[in-house]
Amino acid sequence: MVKKSLRQFTLMATATVTLLLGSVPLYAQTADVQQKLAELERQSGGRLGVALINTADNSQILYRADERFAMCSTSKVMAAAAVLKKSESEPNLLNQRVEIKKSDLVNYNPIAEKHVNGTMSLAELSAAALQYSDNVAMNKLIAHVGGPASVTAFARQLGDETFRLDRTEPTLNTAIPGDPRDTTSPRAMAQTLRNLTLGKALGDSQRAQLVTWMKGNTTGAASIQAGLPASWVVGDKTGSGGYGTTNDIAVIWPKDRAPLILVTYFTQPQPKAESRRDVLASAAKIVTDGL
């Protein structure tokens, strides 16, 4: 009797999955994706972390999703969001001007260096950080909200217990293997990115502004976006650092479909390894094929 009931349950479950997904059961699809990601990781010689959330049904694809990875410049999304959150109670905050000094310049300042001895608004700094990955802009955002610990505190307010920002630019990009500083997990970042861009973590206008900034990113064409159909709309934030660390986090709007959230983190064992945006593009293609 028990064996018969168990067999009936198994047949019913398999039939349900087949009806939902066609002729290939869910477990087979998931296993196939996992195998492809594992092979991509093996061929790349690094460590790959992936988290995909399909908001149509809340299904997920996860690969090393709870391991820590250095965020590098993907952390700029959280810093900009912290400023946007503050602006909810200070309506004119984004227009506030911030002085840019020559002593502020660090290793990568494509926008801020044009404003030395002048000022930039917090809105301009946020756009520079998110769309051009300007490191001076990131440091100004961090300073405005009270330092790295305050950005981490903002993440905690969102329910993210994994994110941690410990340093400023450019030292937050060292990405030393095993170093927990300035890290998160793919799963945690995916959920937080969903809350910020599609959920209620920010007010309506602040959320719309964050999405607009991310859609205007100029650094992501060779990363996640390169693995997606050209008709899909992408808003993303890339990051790179030591040990060939190459990252991209994205909100994706497939044509006539519910949005996707995709986080791809990749790092390598060699301190001076080259960035591998192609790995992120391949991972994006693997997890979105068939959607």
From Swiss-Prot:
It comes from Escherichia coli O25b:H4. Changing P170L: Slightly decreases resistance to ceftazidime in TOP10 strain. Abolishes resistance to cefotaxime and aztreonam in TOP10 strain. No effect on avibactam inhibition. Inhibited by the beta-lactamase-blocking agents clavulanic acid and avibactam, via a covalent binding to Ser-73. Keywords: Antibiotic resistance, Hydrolase, Secreted, Signal. This is Beta-lactamase CTX-M-15. The keyword Hydrolase applies. Changing S133G: Significantly reduces resistance to ceftazidime in TOP10 strain. Reduces, but does not abolish, catalytic efficiency with respect to ceftazidime. Slightly increases resistance to ceftazidime in TOP10 strain. InterPro entries: Beta-lactam/transpept-like (IPR012338), Beta-lactam_cat (IPR045155), Beta-lactam_class-A (IPR000871), Beta-lactam_class-A_AS (IPR023650). Changing P177Q: Slightly decreases resistance to ceftazidime in TOP10 strain. Abolishes resistance to cefotaxime and aztreonam in TOP10 strain. No effect on avibactam inhibition. It catalyses: a beta-lactam + H2O = a substituted beta-amino acid. It is an enzyme of class 3 (hydrolase). The gene is bla. Residues 1-28 form the signal peptide.
